[in-house]
Amino acid sequence: METITSRQNPLMTHIRKLAGSAAYRRQTGQCLCDSPKLLREAAQWGAEVQTVVSVEPWPEPLPEKVRQVLVPPEVMASISPAKTPQGVLFTCRAPGLPVPETLPGRRYVVLDGVQDPGNVGTVLRTLDAFEADGLLLTGGCADPFGPKTVRASMGAVFRRPVWSVTPEELGDLLRRSGIPLYGAALRPDAMDARQADYSRCALAIGSEGRGLSREVLDLCNKTVLIPMSPRCESLNAAIAAAVLLWESWR
């Protein structure tokens, strides 16, 4: 195990760039995660952990190839993406996957233009809880492997596949797979979400501000509406996804 005390060390610079730049994460194929829980989840689910940086020696076994580095608290504070560092962070291979020829599962979630990383991570956590088969991102969503997204997913990013697609790729993939797309939308012709057939489907959810884009709406086989009080205009993406996922799971 090595010790690094300089904030200007190349590894520390690399970690700060992973924390702050989605383009750098894509370029390197790596992501940065912070917290002991996420490290345990990554190890349990077979993520390719590369470097562990901690204030105290990590007490649990790791593969021999994992680089382990000790740093003082002030260096940890300078590299951690968290406001309150938890004393350990790690880099790992971003678990991105090529878009498959078909989707073999039963239920998927499509997020369209959801730019808040907390919402994207929470949707990942929720679809994992309700046993959906994966997440498709389109329309400029938040980076699924950014630190805030990974933290909000509570490790689900290591257990459920995530694909980034264009609307055209999304439509082609769903057609090849024989999966209908249900879009959550505030439209007078939308079906009550409690009455939809969820036996096999993808659930499309847009951002709270603009909803689903025209490109994704045009792909939808039907639109569904979550009944709620007329006092409320809309639900945010993560809550809408949770309601529809629960409805499709029960």
Give, region by region, the residue ranges found by the protein language model.
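Glycine/small-residue-rich loop that forms an oxyanion/phosphate-binding "nest" at active or ligand-binding sites
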Residues: 62, 66-93
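Boundary-proximal intrinsically disordered activation/regulatory segments immediately upstream
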Residues: 1-56, 141-142
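Short acidic-hydrophobic, aromatic-tinged amphipathic segments that line or gate anion-handling sites
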Residues: 3-6, 69-72, 160-168
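Active-site/ligand-binding-proximal alpha/beta "capping" segment
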Residues: 182-232
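RNA substrate-binding interface of SAM-dependent RNA methyltransferases
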Residues: 44, 95-96, 100-188
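Short beta->alpha connector loops at strand-helix junctions that form conserved
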Residues: 71-72, 112, 138-139, 161, ...
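Structured adenosyl-cofactor binding patch, chiefly the S-adenosyl-L-methionine
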Residues: 34, 90, 129-130, 144-157, ...
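Active-site regions of enzymes building and remodeling cell-envelope glycoconjugates
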Residues: 63-74, 106, 199-202, 221
